């Protein structure tokens, strides 16, 4: 299967007083060393075709000569400054033609030539050749890269005529190779000679190689201006399907203050990859972030605005340097990812044994074959270092997408056929069904994160309108009307089922249930309700347990962070 996210080639064309020129293309066009040998022998009409050996060549742009590409890719001036897209058979060309608006005052005064002439180049186009069936998001991303490179080249051309100098060098080398080919056996590709002598050609080659491998492009055009680009399709992908950038962007927009940022590499190596002129705020976020610290705490510790932390976190996630998780705490439930490698002698198993000498990866992963909360691994008599190592192992497995986290969702389920709900005293308590511990026992990890406590309370903007403390206390007429209004959106049989629950006789419980009713549609997990309503976990679990006859509990991934948990590095 071909990789439709990688470009077939990169091409640089120009148009000017000397006509349309193909300055550089990479990979180089494959020349047929013995064209006569293919036509000297007559072929039978029943002979098997040998074109399969050159399928990649035929699918690419190598069948187009330099002259043809220069003609079709060097557009008119009217098309400059906008997206260029051309499909020919199974090849799609994407670029951003750019006009060079030269003025006499912009010609370099340091030119030693006695007669300086105006530059002959009118426009240029950096084009990426793709397969015709490439995803539209890939096409848009490569157009964005072409536009960035064109903008930098246009700036350097105005500043020091960089593009004109490189073009003159390339054309001179092409003429030299063409003259050499006249005395040899056949034509030679000039790009072999251009590559080691032209900085711009090497930059385009580096961009192509990076797009085909890591997807991260870092260029310094003219050893001066930086072009940074990320092809998210190369960084974010699942085991068997392509994750479009739109899905990543939707998840990033859904980040909440109770989420956490998990770096995918150690702090030292990540800081070493940052450019010299990077934002100091980004450095502070990297140094302050922790897997047990939510974004709200991260903003406080880094002394940054929460919105700025969101933006920096989204930047790190988009570039594949971090993922979004829920902060580690005892109540978190994890299970083995369906995409995890469980081979005994896999490279990951070797890395795990090197990182944690007293443990082996298959045995640890076996403990997560079924959903399990971290509280089940706690041993009150064990030293604190053992608990710290447990957190480190979970973080290590989350970084490599070996584990996925499951959240608790609650759905209102009242059957129309039931005239009255049947209380089930022999049922397993709700707290046991969701993996919770005693409601009066605080569940905090030794890392000391407030988010890992059973009594986690966070301040939320929505809390002002929905917090129970703001409602009048007691069974007042106002409270009764508010409860009736909240229950008015339900059907008749749903209201009857709820009111027939014994706990509904308690006005406080009924009012709290009615206030949380819009969360009982299976779209908000337990931790989100805790944050939005500024409510403790124990309060919610007790309420769910009292109304368990009309509630159905499910556990699955949070759609916001599920896209990050499914990604493979």
UniProtKB/Swiss-Prot annotation:
GO BP terms in the entry: aorta morphogenesis; cardiac muscle tissue development; cellular response to amino acid starvation; negative regulation of TORC1 signaling; positive regulation of autophagy; roof of mouth development; ventricular septum development
- List every stretch annotated Disordered: 27-60, 416-477
Subcellular localization(s) per the UniProt record: Lysosome membrane
**Which first-to-last residue range defines the signal peptide?**
none
Q: Which residues are annotated as modified residue Phosphoserine in the UniProt record?
A: 476
Return the GO cellular component terms, semicolon-separated. Answer: GATOR1 complex; lysosomal membrane
What's the main place this protein lives? Answer: membrane
Name of the protein in its database record: GATOR1 complex protein NPRL3
The keyword Membrane is assigned to this record:
yes
Query: How would you summarize where this protein is expressed among tissues?
Result: Widely expressed. Expressed in the frontal lobe cortex as well as in the temporal, parietal, and occipital lobes.
Effect listed in the UniProt record for changing residue 249 to K = In FFEVF3; uncertain significance
Regarding protein family, the annotation reads:
Belongs to the NPR3 family.
Q: Which gene encodes it?
A: NPRL3
Assembly with partners or alone: Within the GATOR complex, component of the GATOR1 subcomplex, made of DEPDC5, NPRL2 and NPRL3. GATOR1 mediates the strong interaction of the GATOR complex with small GTPases Rag (RagA/RRAGA, RagB/RRAGB, RagC/RRAGC and/or RagD/RRAGD) heterodimers. GATOR1 interacts with GPR155/LYCHOS; interaction takes place in presence of cholesterol and prevents interaction between GATOR1 and KICSTOR.
* Coiled-coil residue spans: none
Q: Which GO-annotated molecular functions does the record name? A: GTPase activator activity
Task: Give the disease association.
Answer: Inactivating mutations and truncating deletions in the genes encoding GATOR1 proteins are detected in glioblastoma and ovarian tumors and are associated with loss of heterozygosity events. Inactivation of GATOR1 proteins promotes constitutive localization of mTORC1 to the lysosomal membrane and blocks mTORC1 inactivation following amino acid withdrawal.
Biased composition, class Polar residues, residue ranges: 34-52, 438-468
A Pfam family (short name) is HTH_NPRL3
PANTHER family, alphabetized: CGTHBA PROTEIN -14 GENE PROTEIN, GATOR COMPLEX PROTEIN NPRL3
Give the InterPro entries listed for this entry.
HTH_NPRL3, Npr3
Q: What does this protein do?
A: As a component of the GATOR1 complex functions as an inhibitor of the amino acid-sensing branch of the mTORC1 pathway. In response to amino acid depletion, the GATOR1 complex has GTPase activating protein (GAP) activity and strongly increases GTP hydrolysis by RagA/RRAGA (or RagB/RRAGB) within heterodimeric Rag complexes, thereby turning them into their inactive GDP-bound form, releasing mTORC1 from lysosomal surface and inhibiting mTORC1 signaling.
Keywords noted in UniProt = Disease variant, Epilepsy, GTPase activation, Lysosome, Membrane, Phosphoprotein
């Amino acid at each position: 299967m071909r990789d439709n996210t990688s470009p077939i080639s990169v091409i640089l064309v120009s148009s000017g007083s000397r006509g349309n020129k193909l300055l550089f293309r990479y990979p180089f066009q494959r020349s047929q060393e013995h064209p006569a040998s293919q036509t000297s022998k007559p072929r039978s009409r029943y002979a098997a075709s040998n074109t399969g050996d050159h399928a990649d060549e035929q699918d690419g742009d190598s069948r187009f000569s330099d002259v043809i590409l220069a003609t079709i890719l060097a557009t008119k001036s009217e098309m400059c400054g906008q997206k260029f897209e051309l499909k020919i058979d199974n090849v799609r060309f994407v670029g951003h033609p750019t006009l060079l608006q030269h003025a006499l005052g912009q010609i370099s005064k340091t030119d030693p030539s006695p007669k300086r002439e105006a530059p002959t180049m009118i426009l240029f186009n950096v084009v990426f050749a793709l397969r015709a069936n490439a995803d539209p998001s890939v096409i848009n991303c490569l157009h964005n890269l072409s536009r960035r490179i064109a903008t930098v080249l246009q700036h350097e051309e105005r500043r020091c005529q960089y593009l004109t100098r490189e073009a003159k060098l390339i054309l001179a080398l092409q003429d030299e190779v063409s003259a050499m080919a006249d005395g040899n056996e056949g034509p030679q590709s000039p790009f072999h000679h251009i590559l080691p002598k032209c900085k711009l050609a090497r930059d385009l080659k580096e961009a192509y190689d990076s797009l085909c491998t890591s997807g991260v492009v870092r260029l310094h055009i003219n050893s001066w201006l930086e072009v940074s680009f990320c092809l998210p399709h190369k960084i974010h992908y699942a085991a068997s399907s392509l994750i479009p950038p739109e899905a990543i962007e939707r998840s990033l927009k859904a980040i909440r203050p109770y989420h956490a940022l998990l770096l995918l590499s150690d702090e030292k190596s990540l800081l070493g990859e940052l450019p010299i002129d990077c934002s100091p705020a980004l450095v502070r976020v990297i140094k302050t972030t922790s897997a047990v610290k939510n974004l709200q705490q991260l903003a406080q510790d880094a002394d940054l605005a929460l919105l700025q932390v969101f933006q920096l976190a989204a930047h790190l996630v988009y570039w594949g340097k971090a993922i979004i998780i829920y902060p580690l705490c005892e109540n978190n439930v994890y299970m083995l990812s369906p995409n995890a490698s469980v081979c005994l002698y896999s490279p990951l198993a070797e890395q795990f044994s090197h990182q944690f000498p007293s443990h082996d990866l298959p045995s640890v992963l076996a403990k997560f074959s079924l959903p399990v909360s971290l509280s089940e691994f706690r041993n009150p008599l064990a030293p604190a270092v053992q608990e710290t190592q447990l957190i480190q192992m979970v973080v290590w497995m989350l970084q490599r997408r070996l584990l996925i986290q499951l959240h608790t969702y609650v759905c209102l389920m009242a059957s129309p056929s039931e005239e009255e709900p049947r209380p089930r005293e022999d049922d397993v308590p709700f707290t046991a069904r969701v993996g919770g511990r005693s409601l009066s026992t605080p569940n905090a990890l030794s890392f000391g994160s407030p988010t890992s406590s059973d009594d986690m309370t966070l301040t939320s903007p929505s809390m002002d309108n929905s917090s129970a403390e703001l409602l009048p206390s007691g069974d007042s007429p106002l409270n009764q009307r508010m409860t009736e209004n909240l229950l008015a959106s339900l059907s008749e049989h749903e209201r009857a089922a709820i009111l027939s629950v014994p706990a509904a006789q308690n006005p406080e419980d009924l009012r709290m249930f009615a206030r949380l009713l819009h969360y009982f549609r299976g779209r908000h997990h337990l931790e989100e309700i805790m944050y939005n309503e500024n409510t403790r976990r124990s309060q919610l679990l007790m309420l769910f347990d009292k109304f368990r006859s009309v509630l159905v509990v499910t556990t699955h991934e949070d759609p916001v962070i599920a896209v990050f948990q499914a990604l493979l590095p």
